[in-house]
């Protein structure tokens, strides 16, 4: 039988659809026989057979080797759902039963056999695919989700929660209304490529082209994506292009050589997994094709790439130097993704200072659309964990992110990594009593959503979850029976709605002219204030991070205006301290300081925040003179106080 030729691009390292040839595919033989053809790249192998239930996993069907190192076979009479493996006779003398690296489906763990699957899905999401974009000047509010522990079916009793898992189709019906109610624009799924160990959360992958069978079939996952798109929700796939599980039945020493991984000390990661060898072009094509599968076959809207710092530097250590092969691969990957799917969103989890991560490849950048701002995350959580009395010395932590914000296109993330391994959940990290934690949680999220940058939150953050995440258990939905947690998730929904409907919070947010500090020196008071400037509207964000209120706190502006209250974190409906009538409208008065000639005076609640929508008014030509007179009077009072103290 004449087998399809492997495209030249595969061996050049820039193939994005190798899965169309490699792996298992239904076909018709020249004699009219219906069956499946198999193709696997194993250049170091001395022999390969296809084994499966069709022969009792015994002799197997011998495969033919091409000069390219690709082995092929045709087996008639097989059906979708049948299990198979490759028996690989390695260059080192080993004989190992291997899963198909390009399999589209795999049996449920602990089984490791590949499963024959077709990818002929019917989508009706054309309208969504036409209008989706990179959200540069639109809100991007991502809900990070672990499919197996968001919610379980009633009556689940298994310790690992597996009898409570929703399949992909069922999950869509449960999840989409929640996403819509809380105004998320996208859902980002922790890795769904097949993985043997639940506790790896998908980050130790074995089947890069297989949607995990824990939650159903490839067709059911396609239904999930299609359902999200029909309701206006994007789907982002978490992808692990740096390392893979070292299991003997998968990619490690696949043909008796270090085929996919490095063969030196850099071949193993800190997690005991194998690091991909980016200097082998066929490996680059493998990874590019795996990313391409999610974008092309499953209509995903973006890829979040995990642990990119471990690729940019050898072993993730800047002292060991830049891994130029990895940098070249990532540039090629992002360039290829953008060429084929230009409206997709491609994000990097990177904690290093490597330059130009989000610069286009034509400007020698790595080519990502967004980079997680790990510095913002650490500084924010550190500050809110600081005792109130020590916060004046830590005041700069909440200012620092804006010193470097415009160096990259940043996304602010409070992800799964921040609520595991003894780190505590977001609310439990905060300093103070239960009541103080609750008030500060509202203000912390106010800071997040009013700060420039796209947003991502792990599931449960919107509940004020106190228990650390456990992949074996569903979220503590009973929390919604408690007044604070129910009020907080409603506050979170309102905050997300404000973010989604106030253009000043997303339009032009990567332009330095669209942000201005108003109060950034009030370290003793713990007050921060800043302007978010839109094309037609300015918003004033005010935040008190201390445990006491500030009466008549002055904020100095460059223009006169009236102000309307948009959001009050201490409103009674969110469980806050403001039980009576609130002041909803404010006006500036003439006179200010620091060249800001107008003053807006507000009463700031303890640990509370305000969002005000500003409407400019006609300037007073005497305002500058009034400011100067105030400044002179202040100097005189200061001098008089000094003289009287002598």
Residue locations for each model-derived region?
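Short catalytic/ligand-binding loop motif for oxyanion handling, primarily in non-cytosolic enzymes
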Residues: 95-96, 151-153, 195-198, 243-246, ...
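Short, flexible loop/turn elements at secondary-structure junctions
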Residues: 42-44, 54, 67, 77, ...
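Non-transmembrane alpha-helical segments in soluble domains
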Residues: 176, 180, 225, 291-295, ...
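Short, contiguous acidic/charged loop-to-helix segments that flank catalytic cores in large enzymes
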Residues: 212-216, 278, 320-322, 430-436, ...
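Conserved alpha/beta catalytic core and glycan-binding cleft of carbohydrate-active enzymes
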Residues: 109-110, 299-301, 315-472, 500-555, ...
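Substrate-binding/active-site clefts of carbohydrate-active enzymes
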Residues: 127-137, 146-322
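Carbohydrate-interacting/catalytic domains
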Residues: 1-141, 168-179, 183, 436-438, ...
